[in-house]
Curated annotation (Swiss-Prot):
CC cofactor note: Binds 2 magnesium or manganese ions per subunit.
Originating species: Rickettsia akari (strain Hartford)
UniProt catalytic activity: 2 D-alanine + ATP = D-alanyl-D-alanine + ADP + phosphate + H(+)
Disulphide bridges, residue numbers: none
GO BP terms in the entry: cell wall organization; peptidoglycan biosynthetic process; regulation of cell shape
Obligatory cofactor(s): Mg(2+); Mn(2+)
Record's keyword terms, sorted: ATP-binding, Cell shape, Cell wall biogenesis/degradation, Cytoplasm, Ligase, Magnesium, Manganese, Metal-binding, Nucleotide-binding, Peptidoglycan synthesis
This protein's GO CC annotations: cytoplasm
Domain ATP-grasp: 120-314
Protein name from the UniProt record: D-alanine--D-alanine ligase
SUPFAM superfamilies given in the database record: Glutathione synthetase ATP-binding domain-like (SSF56059), PreATP-grasp domain (SSF52440)
Gene that this sequence comes from: ddl
């Protein structure tokens, strides 16, 4: 299955609550390949915002988002978008110009985290261990494996593991036949066999870590992330105390050096052969669905979903 970016000319606006202490525009859906995930995330968020006593207007974002925001004049924008135009720094940039406080990270940190090769370079520059990777363009016309197998193919700018493929030694795969479905460039990353860990960070503080145990599929792809029964979450992650602490410290380091804001989720692999920790990415707009990791770790840390949303709202600001 392919998930593509779609151009949507007009935003859809729906008033969810007419009274409250402040007016929040909950922006979700949008035009990215992660549209459906964003809409599912927004369902719980809108309930929490209403429970917290806010006046809430829901906006399914289209190209006229600036016009709609100018019309409704919210006090705060809750950025519940995933993927292109929301998670890549576009919406934060617009909100900076409009001087509307918003949740989640700003322009630079969002753009850096969303682009896999730039985030990898950032990790390297800040002495954060990360997997070897290269960029391959469609124009290169490569006919052989661009890296020794096993390796991972990742779209340069997609989230939710959309378009991610792992090419193992035994796979019947010819790179010459790869059709670059998500843009003219991909990241080719060395596959690291090991245990996968996720860390939730809120306002510069790591809340905890969990381990992903695969039940179905060979790697943590889109289907595995969002289908119940495909993966098991072990929370807290069953690790020796010093290694668990290192996970939290490394996550906070990534968050702070990238100048993130609000919630984020850092992803790591503990290599089976060397017991070495590798940072894979940081997600500045983590999911808020029933199967999402940040709310699960927050609950383990004693923060229920409504209080998590309240804490995120407190961080709303724009960059001047």
């Amino acid at each position: 299955m392919q998930y593509q970016t779609h151009w949507i000319e007009h935003s859809v606006v729906k008033i969810l609550s007419t009274t409250g202490k402040n007016h929040i525009a909950l922006v979700a859906g949008g035009m990215s390949a992660e549209r459906e995930v964003s809409l599912v995330s927004s369902e719980g968020v809108q309930q929490a915002l209403i429970a917290l006593g806010y006046k809430v207007t829901f906006i399914d974002m289209g190209a006229d988002i600036a016009v709609k925001l100018q019309e409704i004049k919210p006090d705060i924008v809750f950025n519940c978008l995933h993927g292109t135009y929301g998670e890549d720094g576009c919406l934060p940039g617009l909100l900076n110009i409009m001087r509307i406080p918003y949740t989640h990270s700003g322009v630079l940190s969002s753009a850096l985290a969303f682009n896999k090769i730039h985030s990898s370079s950032w990790f390297f520059a800040n002495s954060i261990n990360t997997a070897e990777s290269i960029v391959v363009s469609k124009s290169y016309n490569i006919n052989t494996d661009p890296m020794k197998r096993p390796y991972v193919i990742k779209p340069l700018t997609q989230g939710s593991s959309i378009g991610v493929e792992v090419i193992f030694e035994e796979d019947d795969f010819n790179f010459a036949d790869y059709d670059f479905p998500y843009g003219d460039q991909v990241v080719i990353e060395r596959y690291i066999k090991g245990r996968e860990f996720q860390v939730a960070v809120l306002n510069s503080k790591a809340l905890g870590a969990l381990e992903i145990k695969l039940i179905k599929n060979r790697f943590y792809d889109y289907e595995t992330k969002y289908t119940e029964g495909f993966a098991e979450h072990l929370c807290p992650a069953p690790l020796h105390a010093n290694l668990y602490e290192k996970l939290l410290i490394e996550s906070e380091k990534i968050y702070k050096t990238m100048n993130c804001k609000g919630p984020a989720r850092a992803e790591f692999i503990l290599e089976e052969q060397t017991n070495k920790l590798y940072a894979l990415e940081i997600n500045t707009h983590p999911g808020m669905t029933p199967l999402s990791i940040v709310p699960e770790i927050a609950a383990y840390a004693g923060i229920n979903f409504t209080n998590l949303i309240a804490e995120i709202i407190k961080t709303a600001s724009f960059e001047s």
